[in-house]
């Protein structure tokens, strides 16, 4: 390659980087604005809750504070450090907790596209590297921060295993896991297999005080390469009996140390008003069903629910789901 052509390529690459930086800046600003809108609806965090990355009982305390005061904790998929910083800044400004989460693709982005992802090493390393950076910064922002990883389908269990190994190593050295929680999304598998795999991993996670999120039913739309946009409408709604099956399978292993991403018509992506038919009464009916079947007293909401595909939802819709 001639020096002239090499310089031309470098100049083009530099221009591309400038354009990318401009896009990143705009995206970060947009994320910060959206995060502020959601977070400002929350009750201010009391000083009794730990600031910085929270795990174990500290995380449960944050969840219970949200449950008792009737607000949701926003979760933002971060694919670059500038987006992560925007979330931290928004949480600080609103004095509210924030869930910072990484997808499999986000992990690869943090690691750099030049790395091979043999045995999921790059996806794991990218998530771990950004998690360590968040841990160093989060305590300075003065609010509880939840470190989480998003959808992990059956074909990505190697990624999940690598993340748990990193958690176990961190726990051995620091007495807590690196991440607060992780999500298993086996919603496309038979429910029996979904629950069996979740049980196996929850036993391992409970040993290091790491929280599990699981999915039952299918969230429509497309995210991180998983396309459910053609799913039949009836499959976008979980049944109370199915949610109760999850409760029966996981509650004996780690009481209240898991959450359920149930389907109530929610979809990934932003759609025109009227195109998404949310039925949050499914969540309320499931809570009542579990209370009745289990004979629970003194608790109106025994299950932690997750609202997937919340982008584009109105404040009224989020409030109704809560």
Task: Name every feature range the model reports, one short phrase each.
Residues 29-42:
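Acidic, proline-/serine-/threonine-rich low-complexity intrinsically disordered repeat tracts
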Residues 1-28:
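N-terminal chloroplast transit peptides
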Residues 75-77, 99-101, 146-148:
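Short, conserved beta-strand segments within well-ordered enzyme catalytic domains
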Residues 57-65, 81-120, 125-142, 154-304, ...:
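Alpha/beta enzyme core
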Residues 78, 147-153, 303-313:
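Glycine-rich beta-to-alpha transition loops that act as phosphate-gripper elements at the mouths
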Residues 40-74, 297:
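N-terminal amphipathic alpha-helix/helix-capping segment at the start of soluble metabolic enzymes
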Residues 45-51, 70, 74, 86, ...:
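Metal-cofactor-binding active-site regions of metalloenzymes
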Residues 310-313, 318-322:
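Active-site/pore-lining binding-face segments in mid-to-C-terminal subdomains
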